[in-house]
Amino acid sequence: MYFPLHCHTHFSLLDGLSKPNQIAKRVKKLGLSGCAITDHGNISGSVSFVRAMNRHGLKPILGCELYICKQHASERKKENASLNHLVVLAKNLDGWKQLIKVTSESNKAEFFYRKPRLSLDQLSEFCDGNLIAFSGHLGSDLAEVVFGEKSKEAFSAKTYEEAESLVDPNWLKNTTELAQKYNSIFGEGNFFLEIQLIDQNISPSQTVVAKALRYISKKTGIPCVATPDAHYASRDDAEDQRVLLCANLETTIPSIKKKMANGESVPLETFFRSNSYHIPSPEEMLEIHTKEELENSIKIADMCEEYNILRQPILPPFPCEKGPEETLRQLCRDGWAQKIKDKIPKSKHNEYADRVKHELEVLQTAGLSSYFLIVRDIVNYVRDNGWLPGPGRGSAAGCLVSYLIGITSIDPIKYGLIFERFYNSGRNTSERVSMPDIDVDVPVSKRDEIIDYIKSKYGQEKVGQMITFQTMMGRGAIKDVLRAYGGISFDEMNLITKHIPDKAAIADELQEMFEETGESSVIRWALENNSEKLMDWCYIDEEGGVQGRLAKRFEQAIRLEGTKRAQSKHAAGVVISPQPLNEICPMILDTKTKQPVGGLEMQDMEDIGMIKFDILGIAMLDKIMGVENILEKGTVI
């Protein structure tokens, strides 16, 4: 047996293919005890990976394949642009915290250059014995040192003899010194020489490097470890991953094949030549690795403690003399006096009283008093500055407490709105309390100022925005697949995708599909419901199979739906934490604003205890304020 320690998910954007749950299913099928996640330059997939592994009773190990530059990362010279790879794993909870610090540091604006990066000396500041590292694949500096100045030539060598002839004369001295430097940085027993042989037939330099590292291991005592370089779960997924690579490289599979046939160099060529970047079976690994190298993978897994990064939501304290529970009750009493007592018929007072009593009992049992006080404070800041907040969006308008304390302006009883649609305590478990979701609509022009106020109140380092990912969905997935293979005109692509709806337009139908089958697909829904319009290209037969001229492409697009494609800053989400954000989650660089944002998605933020508040900039509120201003001035329109 062995333990896969080098695996990428679709959080390695347009490079890794598989979703965390697909990785977990593959590991379970192979009878392995767990798996490590080592995405390129980020740990954004860690929380969803832990959830997936937990569901399948498997051990998750959290790691990252870091980008290492040769000089200090603040240097942006040409000679410091090339990056080497280094894999690090968290041994324990302290190691996870160090991993957060490392990835946050590499994402600082002064260090980020095309990729998040650090020099080895910068990285060493975070190595306190709680991180395990191994040298990396052919993209590592150790592999580079084996060949010296001829490394690029060696990595494209076609035969073992050619690659071996390009080994640097001083390889032994230079490689030994570098390996010992790594060993010193990470601490005795925490550094391993990584042996990858998955593509030795296609990439003979891989075999040369493995031979060199095995020799260094005997010379220094630094152990070797066998790893895959998994970019997808199963061998059958290779063709799907190539679609991602084509989107990344802005090319097509026919173009790549033509260049390879002509002997031209192609970026990421081995991915197009090989189907071996999957999670191998133990039998596959035993064919190419020594027993000791496989046993060391299990040894490393055993060195990594089991720890839990998931936790209950932690609300930041809201300053109030009488405590949040009594303060919220008093605000409800004040709201009653202003909005109910003399404005609602007495015959209905009991209905209102029963409703507010029930809501307070539910909300305060769940420990949510501070949440409502924080939201109210934000809304009050908007009003106190003479700006216009929204009256209440979505299910939050069904909460009488929100109306009484001034978060919303809508009486839920008057309009027959249901509290349980806003907050259902039945979703709470002993492990987790469900958080409410109140969207605060604010003028677009004032949103940044409002966020600055929140930062000033709770602490600059405790407030931040978060990342969101764009995924391949429906139309986009079809277009990515068709572009990758070529042969379809732009006009025909648009004609096809015209009959595939947006995900949001069929959200309820997709939910029903998921409840019935465990999966949901916009494309599949379109084939089942717009069959006549798509018949020229693809259709579903009586047995549920996909048929037609473009059946294979549609099937591929269905498989790719939901795959991460790009990242950006979330349009509305703001998190407020009782402790500095960079102690709880990785901070990544928003390349547009050059500002750090939380490097986890909304659901993942909540799963590690962060509280998310939606502050939505609404342009219509700016326009209404503009009209009010004109009317106040008495300007003739």
Task: Give the ranges of each region predicted by the language model.
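Alpha-helical scaffold/interaction cores of sigma-54-like transcription cofactors
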Residues: M1-I637
